[in-house]
Amino acid sequence: KFKNNEPKKNIISFSLWGDNENYTKGAILNATLAPVIYPEWTCRFYCDKNSVPEEVINKLISLGSEVLFLENNNLAYFGLFWRFFVIDDLNVDRYIIRDCDCIITVQEKLAVDEWINSGKNFHIMRDYASHTELIHAGLWGGITGVIPDMTTLIINYYNSTHKERTIDQRFLRDCIWPILKDCYYCNDSNYNFDNISNNYKNLGRLPINLNIGINW
């Protein structure tokens, strides 16, 4: 059952490292909008304690977000996986994974509500012609207790594969899709994969030149 009066049980999870304003300002904007668009949820930022500016951290905390500190340790692209660590948090019931540089919207919130009402374990969103991955790393979510030991899955995959910028996408395709493929709810505005996808409702829809997952 979705606990809409316990936002700490429902986490919007992000990774954040470095001082690139595309990500730091995006993080702050997401943290600002979340209490309005996602009042039943709490933002959580997994941050590199050595590279994210202190003023950004303080602002995120002041906006009501959770900040958890990690160290990058010069592991190429490993920070992309940090936001997935929420899946092993036993204090969390439900999570959605997002990108700092993609701003949350009413359109996606309505889709998330559809997923919750569907009773399915997982949620997948696609909203552009190039959204052709099985699972896009910043456009999915789920309930905890279904994926076993996510941290170990991540470490084993990371240590056994080529490190490049889509490593998180490949991990989801290779390791997570087989787990969720039989119990997910999908919103997709372009394709009807497996004949179970649902288009987005007209109410709350973004303008024609914008889409969920766009880099703002």
Residue ranges with predicted function:
Residues N91-D93:
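Active-site acidic short loop of glycosyltransferases
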Residues Y95-I97:
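Short aromatic/hydrophobic "clamp" motif used to bind/position activated sugar donors
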Residues K1-N72:
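N-terminal anchoring/stem segment of glycosyltransferases
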Residues A129-T132, G141-W216:
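Catalytic core and acceptor-binding pocket of nucleotide-sugar-dependent glycosyltransferases
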Residues N72, C100-C102:
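Short acidic donor-binding/metal-coordinating loop in glycosyltransferase active sites
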Residues I104-I135:
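Conserved donor-nucleotide/metal-binding helix-loop-beta segment in metal-dependent transferases, i.e.
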Residues V86, F122-I124, L139-G141, F171:
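Conserved hydrophobic/aromatic beta-strand scaffold that supports enzyme active sites
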Residues N74-W82:
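A short, glycine-/small-residue-rich helix N-cap motif at loop->alpha-helix starts
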